[in-house]
Amino acid sequence: DEVITSVTTLTAQKAHEKGLEFLAHVAPGIPEVLLGDPLRLGQILTNFVNNAVKFTERGEIRIEIEQVERTGEKVQLKFSVRDTGIGMTKERAAKLFQPFMQADMSTTRKHGGTGLGLTVCRRVVELMGGQIWLDSEPGMGTTFTFTVWLSVGQQQGSGRVIPDRLTTIRALIVDDNAAAREIIDDLLKGVVGQADAVASAAEAIAAVKQADANAPY
């Protein structure tokens, strides 16, 4: 959480200034206390998010973190930064992690360089026992993904406690962004009794009116 908070603090304002949606999702089930190198993780994520903002004119930037594997007191996490930006061809994407490589000169002139070298990011990820790759398509956006191994730390106290009364609540999620609805729905799983999602205020009003009197929102 500290890493995500730091990254969003540094980058969210830039996204909002361009009118972009900025979303971050940490999947349920990840241990609350992890030991690793938060500075390096933060630098890599910040670099990827800044690049995503730079090369995206409309749409959204989305950070996703999920657990891939757990072996004893070690967990492998997967970090993804997705954008709806200009994207690139497979040929250019394959060269992007080479030293001093940019997608092409026209892109560099319009949007600027990619900040902290992607070659450096790859080396840092490999030092942390992980891998790094990207998926991209021209005009459809880019997703940078990397994995790292972290140690599970000792949790202080009993962790998050969910009051029993919340498990009987029926929640209604209202957001015009499908990705945001998905993230909020995932966060509410195991917290409230039921969560439904709609895309507009009109749909929300209709859902509230149609709700059973014995199970209101």
Show the residue positions of the predicted features.
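Glycine-rich ATP-binding loops of the HATPase_c
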Residues: 129-135
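Glycine-rich GHKL/ HATPase_c ATP-binding element in histidine kinases
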Residues: 140-142
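Short conserved segment of the HATPase_c
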Residues: 88-102
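Disordered, acidic interdomain junction associated with two-component signaling
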Residues: 6, 17, 25, 68-78, ...
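Glycine-rich G1-box
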Residues: 13, 86-87
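Short helix-loop "hinge" at the ATP-lid/N-box region of the Bergerat-fold HATPase_c
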Residues: 52-53
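Short alpha-helical Gxxx[C/S/T] motif in the catalytic ATP-binding
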Residues: 112, 117, 121, 174
